[in-house]
Structure formats: C-alpha cells, structure tokens
Amino acid sequence: MREKELKHIENLLLLKVKKEKIEETDKIKEYLKRFEDERRFDGIKESTIKSDLDRLRVFLDYCINYLGKNPEELKTSDFVKFFNYLDTVRKVSKSSQRKYFLLLKVFYRVLRMYNVIQEFVEESKDRKRFARIEIQHYDAVDAEMLNMILKKIIESGSRTRIRDALIIRLLWDTGCRVSEVLNLKYKDCDLDNGIFKIRNTKTHEERTVVCSSDTLELLRNYVQFNVRQGSDDYLFQNSQGGRVRKEWISEVFRKAVNELKEEGKIPKNRRIVIHSIRHGRAVDLLNKGVPIDIVKEYLGHKSMNTTLIYAHSKERAESLEFIKKLLRIQ
C-alpha cells in the first residue's frame, strides 16, 4: 500500500478532535520555558514534560489572557474559578482535573512561589476536592487516546491492520460491544447511509446504531475485498471469509496499548482494555449533551428507559440523526 493511500486512510480513521486555540504570548512562553528547564534538570521524562506543558498552557492562558493576572498574583478564589472553567467550559473529567491540581502544585514549587497556591492546596485537602477517584473496573478511552491507539495499529506491519483499525473505529462510533460489531452481517448493514442493525445483543433487544461519514467511506472500500459478500456473510472477515475472533481484535488492541504505555504516552496504571472504548463513548456522548436516556438506548444498556425502547419511530430517528451530526463534526 502506497504511503499516500495509507495517510488518507489514517486521516479518515482518526477522530477530528476540536481543541480550543490558545494564544501563546511571550509571557506564557517565558513561564513554560522556566518550568521546562527546571523539570528537565530534575531528570523528568520527556513524555511527562510534554504532557505537563500541554496542561500548563491551559492554566497560563486562563490566568494571563482571561484573568489578566500573572501566576504569582492569583488568589485562592482565582484557582477556584480556574477549576470551574475546566469543569464547565473545557469539560475536563474529574480525574483529569486532579492531574491539573497535582501539576499546579509542582509548577508553583519548582518556580519557588508555592506560597501563592498553599492556601488553595490546604483548603482543597480539607474539603477533599481532589481526593483520588476510585478506579473503576476499566478506565475509559477518550478521543485523544483512541487516536494514538489507531495510529499505532495503522503503523504496525500487520496484514490486517486496516481491517483491525476499522473495527476499533466502528466500536467507537457505535458504542457497541465487541461481539456485536464482529457479529454484523451484510444484511444488518445499510452501507448507503451508515446505519446498522444490532440483532444478537446481550439484552436480547434489537437496536440501531450509526457511524461517521469517514468510517462509512472506509467500510465501502473495505468490503470490496471481502472473500464472501452474501447477505448472511460477516461484514468483517478473516482470510477464509469467516468471522474475526474476539480474541484477535482484543489482542491487537492490548498490544497497541502496551506499546503506548512503554512509550509513556498512556499511564501504566490505566486499566485500558477494548471494552474501554464502549465506556469512553458513553462518557463522550454524555459530555456532548446527549440526554442520558438516549445514550442508554443507543448503547443498549440493561437499565435503559423502557419508554425509549417503544418510542415512536420518528423520535428514534431524530435520536440517531442527533448522534450522526455529532459524528460528522468530530
């Protein structure tokens, strides 16, 4: 496969993540440079420094460009405002807010002005604001992490790398369980509109899901090379035209995650498995304002509202169209 074709496939597979543009002024650059020099002298890993600088830019942008203050001029109330900004404007998760909190403690300590943040730190400790969040059975995958995993799979030497990356991208778009995507057959798929019928579900309830236009373009190209193309044949096939094994795609995902952990791009204490995509998709939809009852129906959770299951077809179509619009603007 030519490099240009591979790049086009990568561009289609990777999620379009919108990030608020930060105006990096000379003053912001000065603080970043001071922090970077100190951390490098401390022998901190480059990958850690990079992720810290990314978060620090957000903080410096807020206090310098929004509040009009230098970091050493902040009051306790300003730190409260910043974390409210992370929560309500940037939609930063609670676990990520804790990372910002830990970073700011380091920032003020290494720049020798810890007294500025000390009151906020003590107050936060007393009020258990950033107490360690209980680790769930699996951690969720977000769009940024998913892109790293997809790129790792695409760049591998595997003969099935495009198929495997496409399966994982469809898992994100649809929020499906792995078995639900691998069980898809041609008769379940509307490849003109990117609509899929999920029939053999854990809850024994049929549901309809959708995919993005980028995923659909790749699917249309991929199915041309399937060994078998009858209505009862699987959408994703192995070299003999049979169903792709769940163990295979789980191992592909696990290998990519482990490599990223070794590179320091994913924290080693994160419990990331292929089912983490489903958890992450649920969080992503809720963060984007999709009503919780629609998310329950879309993902096929056992606790989904029964009134939505039997809702009028028009209401169900509107729900799907709403999710399709979100996929198009990612």
UniProtKB/Swiss-Prot annotation:
State the CDD domains in the record.
DNA_BRE_C (cd00397)
Single biological process term from Gene Ontology: viral genome integration into host DNA
Q: Which residues does UniProt call coiled coil?
A: none
Q: InterPro entries, per this entry?
A: CB, DNA_brk_join_enz, Integrase-like_cat_sf, Integrase_catalytic, Integrase_recombinase_N, Integrase_SAM-like_N, Tyrosine_recombinase_XerCD
Sequence ranges assigned to domain Tyr recombinase in this UniProt record: 136-325
Q: Which UniProt keywords apply?
A: DNA integration, DNA recombination, DNA-binding, Viral genome integration, Virus entry into host cell
Active-site residues from the entry: 177, 202, 275, 278, 301, 310 (o-(3'-phospho-dna)-tyrosine intermediate)
* Core-binding (CB) domain boundaries: 22-112
The answer to keyword DNA-binding applying to this record is yes
> What Gene Ontology terms describe what this protein does at the molecular function level?
DNA binding; site-specific recombinase activity
Specify whether Secreted is a keyword of the entry: no
Name the protein family. Answer: Belongs to the 'phage' integrase family.
Q: What's the protein name?
A: Probable integrase/recombinase protein MJ0367
What organism is recorded for this protein?
A: Methanocaldococcus jannaschii (strain ATCC 43067 / DSM 2661 / JAL-1 / JCM 10045 / NBRC 100440) (Methanococcus jannaschii)
Q: What is the lineage of its organism?
A: Archaea, Methanobacteriati, Methanobacteriota, Methanomada group, Methanococci
